[in-house]
């Protein structure tokens, strides 16, 4: 990859064993029932899964990557604040601490409706919130995400994919959205612009070229501490 970017190794999408049960291992509605009625059994299963998570973390820490990826998809309805605080936050914090001790940065996938999780995110210790998806696809503006993440966390994303789609967002509205986005970037520090969650096939590719024009006009950003 060289100077073109970073190769980032992936850990699990479920940030903790309990999160993996919700995210991958069972139907969501079943998980909610079991979490209320059979929570101790789920916690025992999480303990049995812990060695696998430890092995994944050890493998990531042993590699030469500068940034590692761990955990994804937090939503204040499906990973509601008390659940996030008890079942996800400690695990992310542990991964963040291990990453920092190893001289690495931690990136996690923070798309989703997370307004009521913003005050918990800084306690997780991650360095980059990736795929940040602001309004109109969620209720938070990019400014609110940046304020919630805090001054030491980098926001990766910020351009909701729907503004690139002609059938959803008229050209004039797209231009107004991008003008407002760039007007609120301040110095641009700790922002990596990207399309969230991804670039769907129906986007107007000319609009992606236009985004580059906004970036060029904004000018270079000096990294904090540089």
Locate each region found by the language model:
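Active-site loop segments of alpha/beta catalytic cores
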Residues: 1-226
């Amino acid at each position: 990859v060289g100077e073109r970017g970073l190769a980032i190794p992936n850990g699990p999408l479920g940030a903790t064993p309990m999160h993996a049960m919700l995210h991958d291992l069972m139907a969501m509605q079943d998980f909610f029932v079991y979490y209320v009625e059979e929570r101790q059994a789920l916690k025992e299963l999480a303990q049995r899964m812990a060695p696998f998570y430890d092995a994944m973390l050890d493998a990531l820490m042993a590699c030469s990557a500068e940034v590692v990826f761990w955990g994804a998809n937090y939503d204040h309805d499906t990973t509601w604040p008390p659940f996030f605080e008890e079942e996800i936050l400690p695990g992310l914090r542990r991964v963040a601490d291990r990453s920092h001790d190893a001289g690495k940065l931690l990136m996690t996938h923070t798309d989703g409706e997370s307004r009521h999780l913003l005050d918990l995110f800084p306690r997780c210790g991650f360095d980059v919130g990736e795929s940040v998806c602001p309004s109109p696809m969620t209720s938070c503006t990019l400014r609110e995400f940046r304020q919630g993440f805090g001054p030491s966390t980098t926001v990766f994303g910020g351009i909701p994919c729907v503004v690139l789609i002609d059938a959803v967002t008229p050209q004039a509205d797209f231009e107004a959205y991008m003008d407002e986005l760039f007007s609120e970037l301040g110095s641009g520090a700790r922002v990596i612009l990207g399309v969230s969650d991804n670039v769907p096939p129906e986007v107007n590719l000319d609009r992606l070229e236009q985004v580059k024009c906004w970036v060029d006009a904004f000018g270079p950003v000096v990294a904090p501490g540089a």
